[in-house]
Design a protein with these regions (language model features):
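Structural preference for beta-strand elements that scaffold enzyme active sites
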Residues: 28, 88, 147-149
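Catalytic glycan-binding domains that act on GlcNAc-containing polysaccharides
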Residues: 211-232
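Hydrophobic/aromatic-lined pockets within catalytic cores
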Residues: 116-123, 209, 222-226
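N-terminal catalytic cores of peptidoglycan-degrading enzymes
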Residues: 1-85, 188, 196-206
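Solvent-exposed, acidic/flexible segments
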Residues: 24, 84, 100-108, 190-197, ...
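Active-site-proximal beta-strand/loop segments in catalytic clefts of secreted hydrolases
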Residues: 31-36, 60-63, 69-73, 92-96, ...
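Basic/polar, cationic surfaces and motifs that engage anionic cell-wall
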Residues: 2-12, 18-23, 97-190
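Divalent metal-coordination and catalytic microenvironments
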Residues: 58, 91, 111
Length: 232
């Protein structure tokens, strides 16, 4: 099938920073935190200079509007991994500037809608989140499956931040439900209270841990233990 771009796009400013047409079919989605409450236009603007050596396929501004920075047919430079970017649609999402890099409800709702659209146009009925790097990277998706991956697996970063990382199970669940599919993969528990996220973060920070270490701990708590902040 030919490559298309999302009809949800409200603004287009194409970046010169890409590798041309993909060498792998699209079977991953990689959401990122852009580290700033930026507009859809500003996210594209971040990737216009060739000196930046970075880009993404889509941006989601702080008001929930979607921008197109690199067409889906082309590999963006977003995840510090050639292999991942060749097969992933990369999405930079407006966020706070510091951990847990929280995103507002408009951004999250648009991320869900954009993921649904990407899956539909690429013939996918399920969006999967395993919460495990090795399992994800060694998994061969079925023809109707799309898989979530994250930037932190390929670089010394916390991206997409503890806020979104803890919600990727919920993202996969909501998208799959809207696609009419089903999944047996366990979802990461949804974290519903931002204040509790920050309480845990500040507690661990007070123990002398750095931001990257705290992000990893919080992600593991939510993804693997089944706990929610309200239970801790």
């Amino acid at each position: 099938m030919g490559y298309t771009n999302s009809p949800l796009v409200a603004y287009t400013k194409l970046s010169p920073n890409h590798s041309g047409q993909r060498t792998h079919s699209i079977d991953r989605i990689t959401p990122h935190c852009v580290v700033g409450q930026l507009s859809a236009e500003s996210i594209c603007g971040c990737f216009i200079s060739t000196e930046r050596q970075a880009s993404c396929n889509y941006g989601i501004g702080t008001d929930g509007r979607v921008s197109l920075c690199v067409e889906e047919k082309n590999r963006s430079w977003c995840t510090s991994s050639r292999e991942n970017d060749q097969r992933a649609i990369t999405i930079e999402c407006a966020s706070d500037k510091s951990e847990p890099y929280a995103m507002n409800s408009k951004v999250y709702a648009s991320l869900i809608s954009l993921c649904v659209d990407i899956c539909q146009r690429n013939g996918k009925k399920k969006l999967l989140w395993f919460g495990d790097k090795n399992k994800t990277l060694n998994y061969t998706p079925a023809a109707d499956e799309m898989v979530l991956s994250v930037h932190r697996w390929f670089a010394n970063k916390s991206c997409p931040g503890a806020w979104l990382y803890s919600r990727l199970g919920d993202l996969a669940k909501q998208v799959t439900e809207k696609l009419g599919g089903s999944t047996t993969v366990e979802s990461t528990p949804e974290v519903t209270t931002d204040g509790n996220d920050k309480t845990i973060w500040n507690f661990l920070k007070g123990k002398g841990l750095n931001d990257f270490a705290i992000a990893g701990i919080m992600g593991n708590i939510y993804a693997e233990s089944g706990f929610k902040p309200t239970n801790l």
